[in-house]
């Protein structure tokens, strides 16, 4: 996984290379989806992430990365690939 522009990484989901972007809008969507307010609350929620939470986070990052089919891509992703992609995006952007 590589960073191609600020906030964006490339990741592989299945046979497809996708762009995930951690933007302010994506963070807002993630906070809303997880019912968390702020990065500290998000970190706490991430420690007990459900499959629905993971899908919501991946969808927000894919949408911010420019994928119009973000919902379908997130739902089709293998759980391990989805988790790795989300982790890589946050690690690349929140150092």
Segments predicted by a language model, with ranges:
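Residue-level signal for threonine
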Residues: 23
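A residue-level signal for conserved active-site and pocket-lining positions in enzyme catalytic cores
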Residues: 58
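Charged interaction scaffolds used for protein-protein
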Residues: 1-17, 28, 32-52, 62-95
């Amino acid at each position: 996984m590589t960073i191609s522009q600020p906030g964006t990484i490339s990741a592989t989901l299945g046979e497809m290379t996708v762009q995930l972007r951690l933007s302010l809008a994506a963070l807002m969507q993630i906070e809303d989806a997880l019912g968390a307010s702020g990065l500290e609350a998000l970190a706490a929620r991430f420690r007990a992430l459900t499959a629905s939470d993971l899908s919501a986070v991946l969808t927000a990052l894919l949408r911010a990365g420019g994928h119009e089919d973000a919902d379908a891509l997130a739902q089709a992703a293998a759980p391990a690939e989805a988790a790795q992609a989300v982790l890589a995006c946050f690690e690349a952007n929140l150092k």
